Curated annotation (Swiss-Prot):
One of its GO terms (molecular function) is deoxyribose-phosphate aldolase activity. The lineage of its organism: Bacteria, Pseudomonadati, Pseudomonadota, Gammaproteobacteria, Vibrionales. It comes from Vibrio atlanticus (strain LGP32). It is an enzyme of class 4 (lyase). It catalyses: 2-deoxy-D-ribose 5-phosphate = D-glyceraldehyde 3-phosphate + acetaldehyde. Its main location: cytoplasm. NCBIfam families: deoC. This is Deoxyribose-phosphate aldolase. PANTHER family: DEOXYRIBOSE-PHOSPHATE ALDOLASE.
């Protein structure tokens, strides 16, 4: 197997296969669940709006892949600084049956030099999650500066985040290798690689992109680190590219899904 194919297979199993569109329907989410099951393995998770969680849980169970985790989003996509609303949304997501919650950090508050609201929001959302994985989206493309990106990453980790995530995918600039390196360096430098993961999201579209991101993680945190407990790709179109790279033609797949 070529290096690119090996990276593609690895990336596929680290994907949070995502649909977070205004026109999402139950049918689209069920189709996403079907796409998460491939001939070469399943994606780590799907990422959907909270209201679709019950339908997704049923679809994943019926197709024999209950181990595919269900991630959802809260305080999304604007990252407002109302802690009460973010916590209420997170509690609701947990009640719906989410396995993982991706919450948006109040990044504009940090830009305005308010560190406390972000810390408190993450801390309280983690308390609402309990054992459920909490990923915190810092919106790197809006923070822009290395000092702010590293500060946001540190605050999230200190407040109890299980993952730090680059982006919502809803702003002009999402994940970039440059931003990813900054965030991975924080995980390394704080000595929290055992307990904190990383998720680039938005803009990771090809096997080559995924290969470069994984190579960076291997370089900074060791070749064994980027497993599905510590690394995810938030993406939608990436899956088709990975399957093409792997030359997968799944007879049982719905051709319309690709």
């Amino acid at each position: 197997m070529s290096d690119l194919k090996a990276a593609a297979l690895r990336a596929l199993k680290l994907m949070d296969l995502t649909t977070l569109n205004d026109d999402d329907t139950t049918e689209k989410v069920v189709a996403l669940c079907h796409d998460a099951k491939t001939a070469v393995g399943n994606t780590a998770a799907i990422c959907i709006y909270p209201r679709f969680i019950p339908a997704a849980k049923k679809a994943l169970r019926e197709q024999g892949t209950p181990e595919v985790r269900i991630a959802t989003v809260t305080n999304f996509p604007h990252g407002n600084d109302d802690i009460e609303i973010a916590v209420a949304e997170t509690k609701a997501a947990v009640a719906y049956g989410a396995d993982e919650v991706d919450v948006v950090f109040p990044y504009r508050a940090l830009i305005a030099d308010n560190e406390e609201v972000g810390f408190e929001l993450v801390k309280q959302c983690k308390a609402a999650c309990g054992d459920i994985t909490l990923k915190v989206i810092i919106e790197t493309g809006e923070l822009k500066e290395e000092a702010l990106i590293k500060k946001a990453s540190q605050i999230c980790i200190e407040a109890g985040a299980d993952f730090i995530k680059t982006s919502t995918g809803k702003v002009p600039v999402n994940a970039t290798p440059e931003y990813a390196r900054m965030m991975l360096e924080v995980i390394r430098d704080m000595g929290v690689a055992k307990t904190v993961g990383f998720k680039p999201a938005g803009g990771v579209r090809t096997a080559e992109d995924a290969q470069a991101y994984l190579a960076m993680a291997d370089e900074l945190l060791g070749a064994e680190w980027a497993d599905n407990m510590h690394y995810r790709f938030g993406a939608s179109s990436l899956l088709t590219n990975l399957l093409n790279t792997l030359e997968v033609t799944d007879e049982t797949a719905d051709p319309a899904a690709y």
